[in-house]
Amino acid sequence: MGLQTTKWPGRGAFILKFWLIISLGLYLQVSKLLACPSVCRCDRNFVYCNERSLTSVPLGIPEGVTVLYLHNNQINNAGFPAELHNVQSVHTVYLYGNQLDEFPMNLPKNVRVLHLQENNIQTISRAALAQLLKLEELHLDDNSISTVGVEDGAFREAISLKLLFLSKNHLSSVPVGLPVDLQELRVDENRIAVISDMAFQNLTSLERLIVDGNLLTNKGIAEGTFSHLTKLKEFSIVRNSLSHPPPDLPGTHLIRLYLQDNQINHIPLTAFANLRKLERLDISNNQLRMLTQGVFDHLSNLKQLTARNNPWFCDCSIKWVTEWLKYIPSSLNVRGFMCQGPEQVRGMAVRELNMNLLSCPTTTPGLPVFTPAPSTVSPTTQSPTLSVPSPSRGSVPPAPTPSKLPTIPDWDGRERVTPPISERIQLSIHFVNDTSIQVSWLSLFTVMAYKLTWVKMGHSLVGGIVQERIVSGEKQHLSLVNLEPRSTYRICLVPLDAFNYRTVEDTICSEATTHASYLNNGSNTASSHEQTTSHSMGSPFLLAGLIGGAVIFVLVVLLSVFCWHMHKKGRYTSQKWKYNRGRRKDDYCEAGTKKDNSILEMTETSFQIVSLNNDQLLKGDFRLQPIYTPNGGINYTDCHIPNNMRYCNSSVPDLEHCHT
């Protein structure tokens, strides 16, 4: 029996060839993956070809790349090679900021996110979108897409599309034939004036719809347009021209509704009836003056309501809103209900309104009419048609009625109401007797506490010592006792912790003068006249005038005395002036070698006095003295120092002292 042998060298060669082929294939695949266009930069699965002034997509995009950056170039529609469509690994492409005027062809077939914003795209064809069966997110913001530029049913070709952004284009209506699986649609900042009832008919998966900044009116929205959006969670129709909220809003899942910046002037009672899951509602910047009672009753899940910048008119029609705001749960945040009218409640929060003071034509009586009164009360002649008994010292002041202020009498100033500042706080003063005043007030808004201050106005410009009392907000009157008879008091009421106002704005002050003491009622007319004169002299302004006049009078007297003194001194000085031309001692102290120019010589027996110009005279001490010379002549000299030499008519120097 023979032994079989195997030829191992032939079998080994086959195995070696097999491994060489596999290695070569792997090498080719790896080298293909590692390839990168020369004008781009590759980093793992990212290829960066952005901002390189490219006019076309570079060739040689390697397989395995997932994100392709081609934005901010100059790529046009002719710059997409056919081989780009076969790169299967790319799922995100950035092509914004280029020069495309049509939706591009030959994009990677498996792309899921495509950014084409900030181009000049005007048309969208069905063929271009039919190549992108896996496209889920499409950004076409800030282009030139019009309604006629979109081919019918073009977006329906992208069967996987879920997010479509068409903001800042030229659409005049919502494109018809959108993908049924679309979840978010943005068509804001367009020119949409019409939405047909077919626009959202099959969009049963749409959750977010933004149509802000268009030309929509209630007439341009077909009836039942939004009723098909059964899964809608957020709806924003801001900056349009609606006069009331769109009807038939889907309430099954709607959570956020934004209606601000429209022309809404009324809200029907059933506008929000089905929105039981609504959590956020914004009706700011509209023309709402009032709300129908019960319009928010069905919003049981509401968390935030914003109503800023509406011309809310706070009359009886808004009373239910005030009550509703006081009893809403703490989980609900309401902002913006501020009164814009009437004038006396402008700027006040609706929540803080005191409805007892608002005028209601049918149910609530109006406020009494107040006649302006002078700032201080002074006794006047009693009216013949009214008879009021004199108040006694021990009488008890009646409690004021909260909803009505006392009227102003026409008699001797026993009772008066100060016209309120902007009618937010109304202050009245009732004179009980000569040492007691009762102050009553009524506020249009809720106040935690009041500070009542009073000070006696005396001869001093700053008044007397200021006294004050803190009163709780529930109290509406206070009696001031132990006052001085026939004295003027300044009374101020300051609301504290007011919700809407600063203290300075709502402070109201008044002045009142207490009656004269009843013990002095029998005084004669002269004493009354003296008291009146004394009281008027104590006026701060009169006192200031007297002081100022006295100061001016003293200054005038001092100025007159000073002028008289200077005038007298000037006359006395002018009488002493004598002729002098400015002498120098050296002129005649050199043994007669130089003649003294300050000596007036008279050699004749007679002379005539001639007036000299006063401007040539200089101040100095002048004396005229007769000089007896040795030859019997008379001369004159002015001797200033004892040892001066004299100059005589005979031209002979004399060393003797000057003598008369």
UniProtKB/Swiss-Prot annotation:
GO terms for molecular function: chemorepellent activity; fibroblast growth factor receptor binding. Keywords: Cell adhesion, Cell junction, Cell membrane, Developmental protein, Disulfide bond, Endoplasmic reticulum, Extracellular matrix, Glycoprotein, Leucine-rich repeat, Membrane, Microsome, Repeat, Secreted, Signal, Synapse, Synaptosome, Transmembrane, Transmembrane helix. LRR repeats lie at residues 62-87, 88-108, 109-131, 132-157, 159-181, 183-202, 203-228, 229-251, 252-274, 275-298. Residues 1-35 form the signal peptide. It holds the Pfam family LRR_8. It is found in: Cell membrane; Endoplasmic reticulum membrane; Cell junction, Focal adhesion; Secreted, Extracellular space, Extracellular matrix. InterPro entries: Cys-rich_flank_reg_C, FN3_dom, FN3_sf, Ig-like_fold, Leu-rich_rpt, Leu-rich_rpt_typical-subtyp, LRR_dom_sf, LRRNT. Self-associates (via leucine-rich repeats), giving rise to homooligomers. Interacts with FGFR1. Interacts with FGFR2. Interacts (via extracellular domain) with ADGRL1/LPHN1. Interacts (via extracellular domain) with ADGRL3 (via olfactomedin-like domain). Interacts (via extracellular domain) with UNC5D (via the first Ig-like domain). Can also interact (via extracellular domain) with UNC5B, but with much lower affinity. Interacts (via extracellular domain) with FN1. Functions in cell-cell adhesion, cell migration and axon guidance. Mediates cell-cell adhesion via its interactions with ADGRL3 and probably also other latrophilins that are expressed at the surface of adjacent cells. May play a role in the migration of cortical neurons during brain development via its interaction with UNC5D. Mediates axon growth cone collapse and plays a repulsive role in neuron guidance via its interaction with UNC5D, and possibly also other UNC-5 family members. Plays a role in fibroblast growth factor-mediated signaling cascades. This is Leucine-rich repeat transmembrane protein FLRT2. The gene is Flrt2.
